């Protein structure tokens, strides 16, 4: 049924970006919010607390780490959506921050393809991909053409976390017919509870304005702070929007998914 998938993708004449406010067939009374939690896969702080939250989250799991499969299994069992949190080269930072199997601009086409495919096999239940770090790699057209090409082959969507203003993902996703979305807000780009609270309030204001919104938080250093913040703010968010998995923000996604063999 691959032909059906391609035909459906080609009907998307507008980018499936959260920043495009009115592209979704939403109920008149309700907006939609997708909350993504990055960096699972290494038994990080806040993992259990976040996976136990009583809403549907999108859980981004890093491949090749000690609890990669376990965290993906737990997320799926708890009703969350799972995506692959693919480690990709940043403009700066320690190589150790990337983790194993990172996609870098120095790799050959063949090695990039191999690493991406291995990463996808590592994370059970994954329906999409986003990147870990990646400010350099996501600005590289050669690298991202390979990554997005594999997403298309496998029927996966891509979330551009927007770690650089020079991302080539929107351009290439449109060209290749890959469903993509764009992050609007990081809860914890600064690690303090004051900043996380400020971002949580900004998100609340965005829900008054936007049909569809995506926000990203993390386990790890800020994991417990993010979990605490979400427990506090989720009742407010639920008054303003339906909290949904990322795939719900993509027109026709479920029809595409059901057409896969």
Predicted regions and their residues:
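Positively charged n-region of N-terminal signal peptides that target proteins for export
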Residues: 1-5
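Terminal interaction modules at protein C-ends
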Residues: 20-31, 200-205, 240-241, 247
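Catalytic beta/alpha-barrel core
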Residues: 40, 58-64, 130-140, 154-165
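C-terminal domain-boundary segment and adjacent tail
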Residues: 151-164, 222-261
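Alpha-helical scaffold elements lining the catalytic groove of polysaccharide deacetylases
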Residues: 97-98, 102-121, 138-143, 170-207
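Hydrophobic faces of well-ordered beta-strands that scaffold small-molecule active sites
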Residues: 33-38, 57-60, 80-86, 127-131, ...
């Amino acid at each position: 049924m691959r032909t059906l998938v391609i035909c459906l993708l080609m009907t998307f004449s507008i980018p499936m970006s959260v920043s495009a406010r009115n592209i979704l067939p939403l109920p008149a009374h309700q907006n939609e919010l997708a909350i993504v939690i990055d960096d699972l896969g290494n038994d990080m702080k806040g993992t259990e607390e976040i996976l136990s939250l009583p809403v549907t989250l999108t859980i981004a799991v890093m491949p090749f780490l000690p609890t990669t499969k376990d965290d993906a299994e737990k997320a799926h069992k708890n009703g969350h959506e799972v995506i692959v949190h693919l480690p990709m080269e940043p403009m700066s930072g320690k190589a150790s921050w990337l983790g194993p199997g990172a996609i870098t601009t120095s790799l050959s086409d063949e090695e990039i393809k191999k690493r991406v495919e291995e990463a996808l096999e590592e994370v059970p239940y994954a329906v999409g991909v986003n990147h870990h770090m990646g400010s350099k790699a996501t600005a590289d057209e050669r690298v991202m053409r390979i990554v997005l090409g594999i997403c298309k082959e496998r029927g996966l969507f891509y979330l551009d976390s927007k770690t650089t203003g020079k991302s080539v993902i929107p351009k290439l996703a449109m060209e290749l017919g890959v469903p993509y979305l764009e992050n609007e807000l990081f809860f914890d780009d600064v690690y303090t509870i004051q900043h996380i609270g400020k971002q949580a309030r900004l998100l609340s204001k965005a829900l008054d304005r936007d049909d569809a919104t995506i926000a990203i938080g993390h386990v790890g250093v800020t994991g417990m702070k993010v979990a605490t913040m979400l427990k506090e703010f989720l009742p407010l968010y639920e008054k303003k929007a339906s909290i949904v998995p990322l795939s719900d923000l993509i027109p026709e996604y479920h029809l595409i998914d059901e057409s896969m063999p």
